Amino acid sequence: MEFDRRKAAALAALASPAPDKSPKGGVDAPIAPLLDALNSHPDLFTTSSCSGRVSVLAQPPPPQQADPGGAKTKKKARGGGWVYISHDPADPEALVEVLFGVKEGGGGGDDELVFRFEPMIVAVECRDAAAAAALVAAAVGAGFRESGITSLQKRVMVALRCSIRMEVPLGQTKELVVSPDYIRYLVRIANSKMEANKKRMGGFLDLLQAKISLEASYLESQDPVLQNGAKHGFGNAKRHVLISLSFYPAFISPHGVILTQEEALPTLSGNTTHCLSTAALEITGEPIEKLFLWGQSACALTVGREHHILTFGGFGGPGRHARRNYSLLVNPGSGLLTELKVTGSPSPRMGHTITVVGNDIYVVGGRSGPSEILNDIWVLERSNNRWSKVDCSGDFFRPRHRHAAAAVDRKVYVFGGLSDDGLCSCMNIMDTASIQWNVISPDDKWPCARHSHSLVSYGSKLFLFGGHDGQRALNDFYSFDTTTLKWNKENTNGKAPSPRFSHCMFIYKDYLGILGGCPIRESSQEIALLNLKHKIWFYVSIPSLSQCLCVRSSSVIIDDDLVIVGGGASCYAFGTRFSQPIKIDLHLLESIFKLAYNKEKEMSVQHGSVSNVDLLEGHEENCNPSDNVKVVIDTATLGSSPLVLQLEKKYAKLAKDILKKFGWLDLTRKVRVSQDNIHVLFPVSKTFHALITDKHLKVQPDDSCVFEELLPFSENKLFGASISLQKALEILLLCRGSILKDEVAISRKASKTPQTIMRELVSVLLDKKGLPSQLLEQLPTRWETLGDIIVLPKTCFKDPLWESVRDDLWPLVAKSLGAQRLARQGKITPNGTRDSTLELLVGNDGWLTHHENGICYSLDATKCMFSSGNRSEKLRMGKLDCRDEVVVDLFAGIGYFVLPFLVKANAKLVYACEWNPHALEALQRNVMDNHVADRCIILEGDNRLTAPKGIADRVCLGLLPSSECSWDTAVRALRAEGGMLHIHGNVNDSDESLWLDNVVKSITNIAKTHGLSWNVTVEHVERVKWYGPHIRHLVVDVKCRAT
């Protein structure tokens, strides 16, 4: 690899005794240990460095501009040389002697003298962007806050630096304007900065060495292949784990002080001994960038029978980051992201709250700009998806943001926040029935004023935790009784969560959970949980949270899942980072709590994706099982649910043979692999569960040796010896498995297809109406999906008899296909605007939003055509590199190819020509929805009159059956030096060569008529689809080059 080659060359140069290209000729001694630490990492090497220096530089004065009104010349380095330089603390008397003791020589009399202190700076090349980001994060945490990524092109470069430099002009070499005492004063300041620079370097070195030591320990516990792979910097997932281990700033105190490993460890929660499984939420539909927000607010929302997450507002989003006011729906099961089509949306904002009251959703306050703090109230009426502003009476509600809100019964309770007057400390109660505010003033027992805290409801109580009081982060914990309107500071057992703000808090059953927030520390990788019945804190580890920034995120409970959306942070040094949505399975919490606080303390717990409970707990003491004999049993949540046995893959063959032999494998469900791809999940019977948890089942200490001998056995060898039921259970026990609920419960029973359901329903209808059963032959066997509309082919239901039962027929067909709206395709009108004749059968409105190739297309399907058959061509156009290109689309339509050019190919500018008013309406909407309107110029009318001339790098001609009417227009649109034409056409498969020859000949002749001497060639022919019998939709890429 090029990186490894460059690193080897750089390290060889460092080790060489020959002087390098720097003025000094070698590495500064104070920085040598830090460079060694950086260069020892497989993903980094240093290219230049300076440990920090005190210097006086003599440089020529800037040249005078002869003509002030003339053109400015390019700025050039002024040159010069050092009068004094030291990489150690400067000697003030030696510098005074240099400046005042010698009156002659040492440079020209007109040279300007500048006293400087420059802190450490190191240039580091990184293997990839992930390593660079991790290194910058570590450097910023160590105090080098000006560090950043300087290049991501051919080489990934990072500059490590800070801002404690100083620069003071002293005058000219023969005319100093300062005194010797002032020089001594400057040296004292510079030396203090030098000392601070040295401490930061030492802290950064300690951090790197501690992390590299941690990485080495991690590697020692891994297999040799991984050790070798990490040593050579292989670009796999495990290497990214090593990056995280090496550079995540876990040993940095909230005050920025570097701690040793021993000092940092006590800050961790001492009883973090359990783990919960997590999974990234794979987003489909709308671009995931729409969820890249912080300061948004979210809640659970039921749509039909499915639970969704509604998010509103926040800062970020696609393109240039800004405050947003779109309403998004996330399906936590499928990951489908859709934008809720609403009317009357609130203004863009962040730092607001969103609260569910009955069927309504209330948005309170927020901030729409640095000085625009809001106190407006909006309600989303779910019946018609309309946002309405609420005019409240009663007490005055101060504008605020970063407050917290929760609902009990029909009232919304708002506490704290930031306003123009400072922090808020009163409790504001809005009665949604009377639309009236009631403000309760604080007393001595109330929580102090704060912002960025959390508030949740539990029965008739509200719980408040953390926040920031303007001076420090808080970790006090209060409850508010909504019946007595009194606050109470809660007394709890166990270690309380660390102080934090901008965190998440949630209620799951009888547990209150807290995670994330600022300051970011190692405890950010765990959830603090309070059992609300026993008032006991305990902690559950979520290792994957180390890769997230759960700061100003939103947490929503959906069934047994905790879904975290949004969140992130911005740093001057390495820009903005947003968190991807994740889902955490909470269904084992009850079991974890019982295990953690079991009075007999006889169980053993391991880290993993679930809590690992010693299956042998309660056995006779003389059993002394091996430490490795552990199986997870979630007795609290299993109930009557179907069960699975989770085992590591290496035990899968042996376990499957045993389960099948004794009839414990449930054959009605599928064996499947876990999400982490490490385990296999076997569906098992309740009989197996009863046997495996039998209190009298014993495993002898030496059984593990027998077990290892059995692993390679085949089924025939294993059971040829007539293995007993007792021995089979003991072997499975030694596999260290987990008995879990089968959440998916995938059934092997064949379900009915939509065609079968449709046939059954329609058959009953025909019998009821006395119509012939032969009509069933006209039922569709395929259909198309556009947004939420199922589109039937025009060839189905052709007999006029269907019209007599249409009112009963179409709802049945829609039901069989699971469609909200149903339509039937008609012929595309063969006119200049190619209008759609799609017939809407179920539903009142033809407007839809269709997602394809990561792009959002909105259109009225009854007026505009949409061809899914062109998907591959749209994908091909999106894969082009058009970053510096101007594109002209002569037949833009709703943006079929305009949007791929803009969204995916990153075209510099696209001119979109269209004359269909319905398509124009959709096109204008689509460039806005996809956030590319600033790079698209829409030209309404006949392209032969409106298209630009002489500016295009490429032209798209997407009209079928032929675009020949605008070939002349396309040639005139290209630049004089030529460009690319993408010409569409419907061509008989036997005439393809003739058509291509005609295209080249025609374009050549057109160019000549316009005085253009071009070499016209066919670069590529794309066969998109069959348009009809022997008729192909072709796209030819025609390259025009000036000769």
Swiss-Prot record:
<feature type="region of interest" description="tRNA wybutosine-synthesizing protein 2 homolog">
    <location>
        <begin position="700"/>
        <end position="1041"/>
    </location>
</feature>
<dbReference type="GO" id="GO:0008175">
    <property type="term" value="F:tRNA methyltransferase activity"/>
</dbReference>
<dbReference type="InterPro" id="IPR056744">
    <property type="entry name" value="TRM5/TYW2-like_N"/>
</dbReference>
<dbReference type="Pfam" id="PF24681">
    <property type="entry name" value="Kelch_KLHDC2_KLHL20_DRC7"/>
</dbReference>
<keyword id="KW-0489">Methyltransferase</keyword>
<keyword id="KW-0819">tRNA processing</keyword>
<dbReference type="Pfam" id="PF02475">
    <property type="entry name" value="TRM5-TYW2_MTfase"/>
</dbReference>
<keyword id="KW-0677">Repeat</keyword>
<feature type="binding site">
    <location>
        <position position="874"/>
    </location>
    <ligand>
        <name>S-adenosyl-L-methionine</name>
    </ligand>
</feature>
<dbReference type="GO" id="GO:0005737">
    <property type="term" value="C:cytoplasm"/>
</dbReference>
<comment type="pathway">
    <text>tRNA modification; wybutosine-tRNA(Phe) biosynthesis.</text>
</comment>
<dbReference type="InterPro" id="IPR036602">
    <property type="entry name" value="tRNA_yW-synthesising-like_sf"/>
</dbReference>
<dbReference type="InterPro" id="IPR029063">
    <property type="entry name" value="SAM-dependent_MTases_sf"/>
</dbReference>
<feature type="region of interest" description="tRNA wybutosine-synthesizing protein 3 homolog">
    <location>
        <begin position="1"/>
        <end position="233"/>
    </location>
</feature>
<feature type="repeat" description="Kelch 3">
    <location>
        <begin position="461"/>
        <end position="510"/>
    </location>
</feature>
<keyword id="KW-0511">Multifunctional enzyme</keyword>
<dbReference type="InterPro" id="IPR003827">
    <property type="entry name" value="tRNA_yW-synthesising"/>
</dbReference>
<dbReference type="GO" id="GO:0030488">
    <property type="term" value="P:tRNA methylation"/>
</dbReference>
<dbReference type="Pfam" id="PF02676">
    <property type="entry name" value="TYW3"/>
</dbReference>
<keyword id="KW-0949">S-adenosyl-L-methionine</keyword>
<dbReference type="InterPro" id="IPR006652">
    <property type="entry name" value="Kelch_1"/>
</dbReference>
<feature type="binding site">
    <location>
        <begin position="942"/>
        <end position="943"/>
    </location>
    <ligand>
        <name>S-adenosyl-L-methionine</name>
    </ligand>
</feature>
<comment type="similarity">
    <text>In the C-terminal section; belongs to the class I-like SAM-binding methyltransferase superfamily. TRM5/TYW2 family.</text>
</comment>
<comment type="function">
    <text>S-adenosyl-L-methionine-dependent transferase that acts as a component of the wybutosine biosynthesis pathway. Wybutosine is a hyper modified guanosine with a tricyclic base found at the 3'-position adjacent to the anticodon of eukaryotic phenylalanine tRNA.</text>
</comment>
<feature type="repeat" description="Kelch 1">
    <location>
        <begin position="360"/>
        <end position="410"/>
    </location>
</feature>
<comment type="similarity">
    <text>In the N-terminal section; belongs to the TYW3 family.</text>
</comment>
<feature type="repeat" description="Kelch 4">
    <location>
        <begin position="512"/>
        <end position="559"/>
    </location>
</feature>
<dbReference type="GO" id="GO:0031591">
    <property type="term" value="P:wybutosine biosynthetic process"/>
</dbReference>
<feature type="region of interest" description="Disordered">
    <location>
        <begin position="53"/>
        <end position="75"/>
    </location>
</feature>
<keyword id="KW-0808">Transferase</keyword>
<dbReference type="InterPro" id="IPR056743">
    <property type="entry name" value="TRM5-TYW2-like_MTfase"/>
</dbReference>
<dbReference type="InterPro" id="IPR030382">
    <property type="entry name" value="MeTrfase_TRM5/TYW2"/>
</dbReference>
<keyword id="KW-0880">Kelch repeat</keyword>
<feature type="repeat" description="Kelch 2">
    <location>
        <begin position="412"/>
        <end position="460"/>
    </location>
</feature>
<dbReference type="GO" id="GO:0102522">
    <property type="term" value="F:tRNA 4-demethylwyosine alpha-amino-alpha-carboxypropyltransferase activity"/>
</dbReference>
<dbReference type="Pfam" id="PF25133">
    <property type="entry name" value="TYW2_N_2"/>
</dbReference>
<protein>
    <recommendedName>
        <fullName>tRNA wybutosine-synthesizing protein 2/3/4</fullName>
        <ecNumber>2.1.1.282</ecNumber>
        <ecNumber>2.5.1.114</ecNumber>
    </recommendedName>
</protein>
<dbReference type="InterPro" id="IPR015915">
    <property type="entry name" value="Kelch-typ_b-propeller"/>
</dbReference>
